[in-house]
Amino acid sequence: MSWDLGLFGAREAGERNAAASVLDARGRLQAARVALVADVVHRYLDIRMAQRQRALIDEQALLDARALQLAQVRQQQRLGTAEAVHQLQLQAGQSAALRASLRETQARSAHMLAALLGRTRPDAQWLQADAKAPLPGPQALGVAVLPADLLRTRPDIQVAQAAVERAAAEQGIAHAALYPRFVIGGSLLYSFNITQNLRTTQDNAPTFGPQIDIPLFDWGRRRSQADASELALQAAVQAYRQSVLDGVAEVESALAALDAQRERIASLQSTQQVLAERERVQDQRLKLGLDSEFGGLAPRRAALQARSEQTTALAAHALAYVALYKALGGAPLPAEDQDAADSLSLIHI
């Protein structure tokens, strides 16, 4: 065994290197937690959006089928053209293709969510269409400028900070290597001869004394290593600064996306109100005999498309929150002894 005195900053550099390793491990653990929570929420939102969209596309398919039936009757009665029938047939085919695409997206998201939750198969409810599938509504964030401390919770910034600490520790070790190193060591060598029945004083050889490492013949190598460690420290500092700038840019982009999606939802709500009023007027005209059923199908289909766009906007707004969560590194940090599954308790599926 040996005991290094750790002179000339060697002991402090070793402790700093160990602390950097702990910080790096915490950053990578936090990155795994953030990725897990974000992926679970992302797949959950995909499922809910697909459930709503499938319910809307099924209702739209019924309207398309009815419109095609009425168009064929109008063509037979010389009130419509074959081109109108062809357009409605193409429209019905596009709706069927969209329905298949939504079913595929929903199934893929359901299986991925089941895998993230440690299940072998998804719940049957996740694969059904549901017009009332819950989606979070738009909410104002209420924060104009985020504190800089929130960025420190980003895993990549923590890893970059750990790299700076490690580079500084290596630079300290390389600097300490330029000076003599003092180590107090001791050992005990014991042997036993199986041909003898008695123990003798020659069976063990203890040693104890100091060891001195002097940079005499390898001074140039140690000096070059110290210079290289200094440059590595400067590179780590620059990488840390770039990580901070990238984090700020990602957070700003997420906030901009939140504002844009909020404005989009507000615009779609205004459009939906206009279409709802138009549909109400059309129904009134139909009751009074001033219009036909065929003429009222187009406004109803436009209202369904507006609802579909609003569903997409709500999901995009929720995903923007997920992007902001990832951009902030999942701030605040969870307790070290908290299991990763506890982070999923806020998500009700």
Regions found by a protein language model. Give the residues of each.
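C-terminal substrate/ligand-recognition segments
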Residues: 215-225, 251, 257, 261-272
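Periplasmic alpha-helical coiled-coil/stalk elements that build and connect Gram-negative outer-membrane
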Residues: 11, 27-146, 257, 261, ...
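Small/polar, glycine/serine/threonine/aspartate-rich low-complexity segments that form flexible
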Residues: 1-2, 123-143, 165, 172, ...
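Bacterial Sec-pathway N-terminal export signals of envelope proteins
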Residues: 79-82, 135-165, 215-216, 241-244, ...
